[in-house]
């Protein structure tokens, strides 16, 4: 069978447009832009994190065919993991507090995830949904996404979000009225755009 011109769902994560926020721009006298992350397949910026976490786990060998991905989440990271993990053939188990809406739980299941609800508990409590996910991963040998401490989460933005914003705004950065703002905003991003760059001698 020939190669299809269509791609899997993960190919459509990112490359979201910048939208001018007209009223805020007029109120402040600045050009204020919003990155339309709701246009990702799962409807949020967390699709980038999910794709980055899964891709890094595959590259490291921790995530292999037939593996289970588990995460404790009450937010959109679970949706991203369900969407991308299921598309790549993994079992995805989301541990979620029982005070979340039935609609969110239904959506997770519709996207292919299994859902375990647990009573709400403080973050550091052993019964907290994130701690339950960690414990089950250790006991069962599953892959814990660990979004809060997983550097692949942040690196997903270094490798995708930052270059996108740079490309989408570079045409404006040459203008005199934009140059200083662009310099301040992009100083920390330079490590991604030009990985060999050193940090500035002093903060801007």
Question: Which residues does each predicted region cover?
Answer:
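PLP-dependent amino-acid enzyme catalytic core
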Residues: 1-204
């Amino acid at each position: 069978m020939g190669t299809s011109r269509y791609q899997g769902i993960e190919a459509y994560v990112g490359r979201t447009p910048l939208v001018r926020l007209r009223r805020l721009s007029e109120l402040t006298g600045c050009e204020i832009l919003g990155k339309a992350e709701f246009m990702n397949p799962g409807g949020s910026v967390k699709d980038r994190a999910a794709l980055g976490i899964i891709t890094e786990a595959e590259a490291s060998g921790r995530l292999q065919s037939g593996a289970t991905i588990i995460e404790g989440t009450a937010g959109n990271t679970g949706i991203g993991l369900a969407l991308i993990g299921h598309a790549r053939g993994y079992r995805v188990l989301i541990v979620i507090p029982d005070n979340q809406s039935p609609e969110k739980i239904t959506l997770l299941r519709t996207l292919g995830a299994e859902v375990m609800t647990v009573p709400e508990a403080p973050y550091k409590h052993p019964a907290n949904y994130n701690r339950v996910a960690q414990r089950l991963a250790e006991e069962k040998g599953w892959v814990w996404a660990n979004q809060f401490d997983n550097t692949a989460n942040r690196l997903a933005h270094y490798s995708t979000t930052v270059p996108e914003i740079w490309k989408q705004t570079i045409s404006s950065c040459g203008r005199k009225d934009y140059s200083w703002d662009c310099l301040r905003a992009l100083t920390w991003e330079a490590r991604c755009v030009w990985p060999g760059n050193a940090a500035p001698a002093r903060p801007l």
